[in-house]
Amino acid sequence: MRHLLSAADLTRDEATAILDDADRFLQALAGREVKKLPTLRGRTIITMFYENSTRTRVSFEVAGKWMSADVINVSASGSSVAKGESLRDTALTLRAIGADALIVRHPASGVAAQLAQWTAEGEGGPAVVNAGDGTHEHPTQALLDALTIRQRLGSLEGRRVVIVGDILHSRVARSNALLLNTFGAEVVLVAPPTLLPVGVGTWPVTVTHDLDAELPGADAVLMLRVQAERMTGGFFPSAREYSVLYGMSEARQRLLPEHAVVLHPGPMLRGMEIASAVADSSQSGVLQQVSNGVHIRMAVLFHLLVGSSDSPEAVPA
């Protein structure tokens, strides 16, 4: 695996190996007073975040540091981009400095793939990880969601996963639809017609607008935030009406099977797409997702920079 740009880049075997190694990292670090492994000692990881982020940015930094890598953060405001330098020149500069991996988040779709192309000119070049590109994809989020479902339910094959909310602006929805399909899960999208993207009919999903009808048969429900910062018009009449039709209330939670897990990629708008009582309930996997984010990103960096778990620097058993 050279880069991770899309959930579609992963075969089922590759994705399973990443989930398995994430679990192994979790076990290797459990109970350690000092969370440190030598796996990536001497490697340099540079994070390039051109959009605000808490969970993804911090978990990538923690993942690298827990594996003894040198992790450097480059932001738009603190780099020469603020002086007018192009993203291409920034990327080539970081390659010349000796970066082993570039973790990029950017408001424009396709930037991660472009970065991989620019830095691959000639021989070598850093591994590139897409940490979210516009409304396109967020593959490591899909991996950690899949890991959380697998930990809760034991398997992904044949599971019914319902993704609810602002599908139109969600890179998480697209990556989850692709990855869960790879794992053999059934994916159902629930959203108002105004929040569904053009071309959603080509995705490996079922689309509906009736949330209540889908909950009794759901094994997992992924609630999405309404991304008001990406909206230029009125996509629904009001926040209250949206919450009534598409929010995960306590009443809706009671429609779920007892084994079902409720997920949210964050940040959550409590009281809009999810009630606080649901987010904090025993069926919620929200904090488990956050924890899994570190271990998944450790596993991704391991596979990109070291190789398979059969290599000499394998994940600790």
Curated annotation (Swiss-Prot):
BP term (GO), one: amino acid metabolic process
Swiss-Prot/TrEMBL catalytic activity: carbamoyl phosphate + L-aspartate = N-carbamoyl-L-aspartate + phosphate + H(+)
EC number of the protein: 2.1.3.2
Presence of keyword Phosphoprotein: no
GO CC annotation, single: cytosol
Superkingdom of the source species: Bacteria
Binding, carbamoyl phosphate: 55-56, 105, 138, 141, 266-267
EC top class, as a word: transferase
Molecular function GO terms recorded: amino acid binding; aspartate carbamoyltransferase activity
Pathway entry: Pyrimidine metabolism; UMP biosynthesis via de novo pathway; (S)-dihydroorotate from bicarbonate: step 2/3
Binding site for L-aspartate: 83, 171, 225
Keyword list, A-Z: Pyrimidine biosynthesis, Transferase
Entry keyword Transferase: yes
Pfam family, one: OTCace
SUBUNIT field: Heterododecamer (2C3:3R2) of six catalytic PyrB chains organized as two trimers (C3), and six regulatory PyrI chains organized as three dimers (R2).
Protein family: Belongs to the aspartate/ornithine carbamoyltransferase superfamily. ATCase family.
Function statement: Catalyzes the condensation of carbamoyl phosphate and aspartate to form carbamoyl aspartate and inorganic phosphate, the committed step in the de novo pyrimidine nucleotide biosynthesis pathway.
Family annotation (HAMAP family): Asp_carb_tr
The protein's name: Aspartate carbamoyltransferase catalytic subunit
